[in-house]
């Protein structure tokens, strides 16, 4: 399906690009999330009229993400979980737990923005985690998992 992108989409294209993607990806994700529209003549003409407005909104989102990224970069988040004597957790620390801990510290982060390169954290200690605030803004946060011995 031919679509016109209304914002930058990772691994697809930038604002204003007309790209061909799988029908399901367009119908189920891009179009409902207002990231794209079908590339009809009317939609392309309407986009060209609104291009400056959309570019301004995209620049505002990027600058807001960069500002939040500067505050968040290099930060350490502490999460306490029950653990055995060998340092292994009963359960694990997931991206939802990390997003909730960041929320308590005043940062609005969705769980989908937290990237765990090796999956959920299952050991006590410090772990590097990537937080993707925008397609162009990714910061590293250290998650310190503290063990509560049972």
Curated annotation (Swiss-Prot):
Cystines in this chain? none
Residues spanning the membrane: none
Q: Which residues form a coiled coil?
A: none
Alphabetically, the GO molecular function entries are: rRNA binding; structural constituent of ribosome
What does UniProt give as GO cellular component?
A: ribonucleoprotein complex; ribosome
Instruction: Name the GO terms of the biological process aspect.
Output: translation
Entry keyword set: Ribonucleoprotein, Ribosomal protein, RNA-binding, rRNA-binding
What family does the database annotate?
Belongs to the bacterial ribosomal protein bL9 family.
Q: What does this protein do?
A: Binds to the 23S rRNA.
**Protein's UniProt name:** Large ribosomal subunit protein bL9
Q: Which organism is it from?
A: Paraburkholderia phymatum (strain DSM 17167 / CIP 108236 / LMG 21445 / STM815) (Burkholderia phymatum)
- Highest classification ranks of the organism: Bacteria, Pseudomonadati, Pseudomonadota, Betaproteobacteria, Burkholderiales
């Amino acid at each position: 399906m031919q679509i016109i992108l209304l914002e930058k989409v990772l691994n697809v294209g930038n604002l204003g690009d007309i790209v061909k993607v799988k029908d399901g990806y367009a119908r189920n994700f891009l179009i409902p999330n207002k990231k794209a529209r079908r590339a009809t003549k009317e939609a392309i003409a309407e986009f060209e009229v609104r291009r400056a407005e959309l570019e301004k909104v995209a620049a505002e989102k990027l600058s807001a993400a960069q500002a939040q990224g500067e505050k968040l970069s290099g930060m350490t988040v502490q999460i306490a979980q029950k653990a055995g004597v060998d340092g292994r957790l009963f359960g694990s620390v997931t991206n939802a737990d990390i997003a909730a801990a960041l929320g308590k510290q005043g940062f609005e982060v969705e769980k989908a923005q937290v990237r765990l390169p090796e999956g959920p954290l299952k050991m006590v200690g410090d772990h590097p985690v990537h937080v993707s605030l925008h397609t162009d803004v990714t910061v590293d946060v250290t998650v310190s998992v503290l063990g509560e011995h049972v």
